[in-house]
Design a protein with these regions (language model features):
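Residue-level signal for inorganic ion chemistry
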Residues: 1, 12, 36, 119, ...
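Active-site phosphate-binding/coordination module
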Residues: 2-92
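Acidic, Mg2+-coordinating phosphoryl-transfer loop and its flanking beta/alpha structural elements
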Residues: 12, 167, 177-214, 219-221
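Hydrophobic packing residues within well-ordered alpha-helices of enzyme cores
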Residues: 19-23, 131, 135, 194, ...
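Short, structured coil segments at secondary-structure junctions
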Residues: 26-28, 35-36, 44, 139-142, ...
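Short, charged, surface-exposed secondary-structure boundary motifs
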Residues: 42-44, 211-217, 227-231
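Conserved acidic, metal-coordinating active-site core of Asp-based
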Residues: 69-184, 188-196
């Protein structure tokens, strides 16, 4: 794509700490939009260059309200400096021995330091959809609750911050119109971005809501669906 003068940018729910393996694929501009739009990560320098976080009073209130509704909930936070783990947070997606990893800050979620771009909440006792919908109702206008396919995980970001808003800002800085953007997605957290882009593609392996929204459904991830679409413009 670079040789054709087409910019490509990764926009992901993943935190910066999961991005480094993608370094060779990121492209000349060298950045990835992470954490559902909360962070812009410069891969070569291994640093977050832009960060938007939850206001501390909102974070504290959200934690208290969600905990009251779901007593078994555990929390974690994604920050520019890395992850913060509350003692009660359990997830099959945590790396092995995460609770013993010295690079991860640990303690009650109320003690988290720095910018919290994404607050993670998980209650193993509550069905996935019911939990995410319940948390969204509790959070209301204080933040945006996203679901990226991780079992039972509610991802709470700052109000007004989505993949779409971050990508729109990135494009504006480069003089790229929404009409000229092709976006690919597979999960509900992609929906605002797909609605914003001039042309949207849902992966066939993706969520049914996303496939209903997109302009076109392409082959799934295992069948190189993105590559198949991009071959059209060579």
């Amino acid at each position: 794509m670079w040789s054709l003068g087409i910019e490509t940018v990764f926009v992901t729910a993943r935190p910066p700490r999961w991005i480094d393996p993608l370094a060779e694929h990121v492209g000349g501009h060298g950045v990835v939009i992470c954490a559902n739009g909360a962070f812009v990560y410069e891969v070569a320098a291994r640093r977050v260059v832009e960060a938007v976080g939850l206001a501390r009073p909102s974070l504290t209130a959200i934690v208290a309200d969600v905990r009251e509704a779901y007593p078994g909930v555990g929390f974690a936070a994604e920050r520019p400096e890395g992850m913060h783990l509350d003692p009660g947070y359990r997830s099959p997606m945590l790396p092995p021995h995460a609770h013993d990893d010295p690079s991860i800050e640990r303690g009650p979620i109320e003690s988290v330091r720095g910018v919290v771009g994404k607050l993670l909440a998980r209650d193993p006792a509550t069905p996935d959809v019911a939990f995410v919908e319940g948390v969204a109702a509790i959070v209301a206008e204080r933040g945006i609750v996203a679901y990226s396919g991780a079992g039972g995980l509610a991802e709470i970001g700052p109000p007004g911050v989505t993949k779409a808003t971050a990508l729109a800002r990135w494009c504006l800085e480069r003089g790229i119109d929404a009409a000229d953007v092709w976006a690919f997605g597979d999960m509900p957290n992609d929906e605002p971005m797909l609605a914003w882009a001039g042309r949207s593609f849902a992966m066939d392996s993706g969520h049914e809501e996303v496939k209903a929204l997109a302009d076109e459904v392409c082959a799934g991830n295992d069948d190189d669906g993105v590559a198949q679409v991009l071959e059209r413009i060579r």
